[in-house]
A protein has these predicted regions:
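Nucleotidyltransferase catalytic core that binds NTPs
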Residues: 2-169
Length: 169
């Protein structure tokens, strides 16, 4: 698809004036464990909202595992962060992301990638999700200043008694 300008000077995808960048791509799904939700996640949400009319932040959990934070606390924390953003919905789910995406009727799955290893893994997952549901995945590269930040690093720092507040929104 090509990007070109419409009569209003706004970029459009493929010449379709209904797909203005800055919203218009329908409903996106940002899945993750968000254990905890970091500044990196918040940056991906901000950038995804430039593309989608609505974004569902899907907090995934495995019933067989206990997370660092209970899933209910993760959902409540993220809801509180976005309480003034009506385009953000927060839900928890278990099972395959592709199945949850299909259930919600999303336009695309959004994933942040920090490294080439993340990219390769996410490309494989995107292919599987597309084959299962026909739903595409949009990969957003991490902002350079946040590329080294991950939930697992934050958990490890907290485990050793470090203040992690500067990594959290």
């Amino acid at each position: 698809m090509s990007l070109k300008d419409n009569k209003k000077g706004q970029s459009v995808v493929g010449g379709n004036d209904s797909l203005l960048l800055g919203g218009g791509l329908g409903r996106g799904l940002l899945p993750g464990s968000f254990d905890p939700f970091t500044l990196g996640h918040a940056d991906i949400v901000k950038r995804a909202l430039e593309l989608f009319d609505e974004l569902v932040i899907a907090v995934g959990y495995n019933e067989q595992k206990s997370g660092w934070m209970p899933v209910e606390e993760r959902v409540a924390t993220i809801k509180k962060l976005y309480k003034d953003e009506p385009r953000v919905k927060v839900e928890s789910y278990t099972g395959l992301t592709a199945d949850f995406a299909r259930k919600l009727g999303v336009t695309a799955i959004v994933r942040g990638v920090r490294t080439t290893a993340d990219f390769e893994y996410e490309m494989q997952m995107a292919d599987v999700n597309r084959r299962l549901t026909g739903i595409e995945t949009i990969l957003l590269p991490a902002s350079p200043q946040l590329a080294s930040l991950s939930s697992s690093i934050v958990r490890e720092l907290a485990h050793f008694g470090h203040d992690v507040s500067k990594f959290l929104p």
